[in-house]
Swiss-Prot record:
InterPro entries: CysW_permease, MetI-like, MetI-like_sf, Sulph_transpt2. Its main location: membrane. The lineage of its organism: Bacteria, Pseudomonadati, Pseudomonadota, Gammaproteobacteria, Enterobacterales. It is found in: Cell inner membrane. One of its GO terms (cellular component) is ATP-binding cassette (ABC) transporter complex, transmembrane substrate-binding subunit-containing. This is Sulfate transport system permease protein CysW. Residues 1-22, 91-104, 163-200, 269-291 are cytoplasmic. It comes from Escherichia coli (strain K12). Coiled coil: none annotated. The chain crosses the membrane at residues 23-43, 70-90, 105-125, 142-162, 201-221, 248-268. Residues 44-69, 126-141, 222-247 are periplasmic. It is a multi-pass membrane protein. It holds the Pfam family BPD_transp_1.
Length: 291
C-alpha cells in the first residue's frame, strides 16, 4: 500500500516545463549552429552529382593540398607529443622558480590571435627579420614555404598535449615512479612501464585535439604560406582559393573532406574521453574499496 501511495505521489509531481523548454532551445540552437551547416556542406558538395566531386578530388592542386595538410599534421603532432610529455613531466615532478610562469606561457597560443602569431613568425624569419639574412645566405627558405607552415602549426597546437597531461599526472602523484626507481628501474623503464600506462588515454586525447587543430588551422598558416597555388596551399587555404575562383562545387568538396576529417577526429575524441572517464571512475572505486 505504501508503494502505491509513493507511486501516486511521484506521478502527481508537476512537469517541469521550464527545464524541457531550455533543453529544447539548447538542442534547437545547437542544431542550427552546428549540425545544419555541416549537412549543408555535404548537400552543396554533391548538388551536381558524384562525378564533379570525384573530379575535384582528383585535381592535382586538391591532391597537393590534401598531401600538404596531412604532412603538416604528421610533423606537428609528433613534435608536440614529445614536447608535451617532457614539459608535463617537468612541471609535475619538479618544483622550480618560474614554474607557474611557464604554465601561464603555455596559454599564449590560446590567447593570441593565429593571424598575429603568423605575422610574428613572418617578421622574425622573413628576409628583413633577425634570422632572415642568415637564412638567405644559406639558401634556407622558411617563410612562404612548408617549413613556415609547420612552425606556426606547432605554435598554435603546442598547449593541447601539455594541458591534458598535467592534471592527470598531478592527480596520480609520483609515488609509483619513485617506487619503480627504488626497485632498480631505469628512467626509460619507469616511463614505459609505469608512467605511460597511467597517462596513455590523456595523452591520446591531447594528440587527437592537436591533430584536429593542425588540419584545420587557417589564420597563422595563411600569413606565412604566401598562398602559392599548388605549392603552399593547405586544405583550408584551398577552400578559400576555390571560393574566390567561383568554383562552388570544388570549395564545398574540399570543405566536405575537411569536415569528414573533423568528424572522424571528434569521434575518436569522444571515444577516448569515454575511456578516460571510465578509467578515472574505476580508479576512484578502487581507492574507495581500499579505504
Amino acid at each position: 500500500m505504501a508503494e502505491v501511495t509513493q507511486l501516486k505521489r511521484y506521478d502527481a509531481r508537476p512537469i517541469n516545463w521550464g527545464k524541457w523548454f531550455l533543453i529544447g532551445i539548447g538542442m534547437l540552437v545547437s542544431a542550427f549552429i552546428l549540425l545544419v551547416p555541416m549537412i549543408y556542406i555535404f548537400v552543396q558538395a554533391f548538388s551536381k552529382g558524384l562525378m564533379p566531386v570525384l573530379q575535384n578530388l582528383a585535381d592535382p592542386d586538391m591532391l597537393h593540398a590534401i598531401w600538404l595538410t596531412v604532412m603538416i599534421a604528421l610533423i606537428a603532432v609528433p613534435v608536440n607529443l614529445v614536447f608535451g610529455i617532457l614539459l608535463a613531466w617537468l612541471v609535475t615532478r619538479f618544483n622550480f622558480p618560474g614554474r607557474q610562469l611557464l604554465l601561464t606561457l603555455l596559454d599564449i597560443p590560446f590567447a593570441v590571435s593565429p593571424v598575429v602569431a603568423g605575422l610574428v613568425y613572418l617578421l622574425f624569419y622573413g628576409s628583413n627579420g633577425p634570422l632572415g639574412g642568415w637564412l638567405d645566405e644559406h639558401n634556407l627558405q622558411i617563410m612562404f614555404s612548408w617549413p613556415g607552415m609547420v612552425l606556426v602549426t606547432i605554435f598554435v597546437t603546442c598547449p593541447f598535449v601539455v594541458r591534458e597531461l598535467v592534471p592527470v599526472m598531478l592527480s596520480q602523484g609520483s609515488q609509483e615512479d619513485e617506487a619503480a626507481i627504488l626497485l632498480g628501474a631505469s628512467g626509460w623503464q619507469m616511463f614505459r612501464r609505469v608512467t605511460l600506462p597511467n597517462i596513455r588515454w590523456a595523452l591520446l586525447y591531447g594528440v587527437v585535439l592537436t591533430n584536429a587543430r593542425a588540419i584545420g588551422e587557417f589564420g597563422a598558416v595563411s600569413v606565412v604560406s604566401g598562398s602559392i597555388r599548388g605549392e603552399t596551399l593547405s586544405l583550408p587555404l584551398q577552400i578559400e582559393l576555390l571560393e574566390q575562383d567561383y568554383n562552388t562545387v570544388g570549395s564545398f568538396t574540399a570543405a566536405a573532406l575537411l569536415t569528414l576529417m573533423a568528424i572522424i577526429t571528434l569521434f575518436l575524441k569522444s571515444m577516448l574521453q569515454w575511456r578516460l572517464e571510465n578509467q578515472e571512475k574505476r580508479a576512484q572505486q578502487e581507492e574507495h574499496h581500499e579505504h
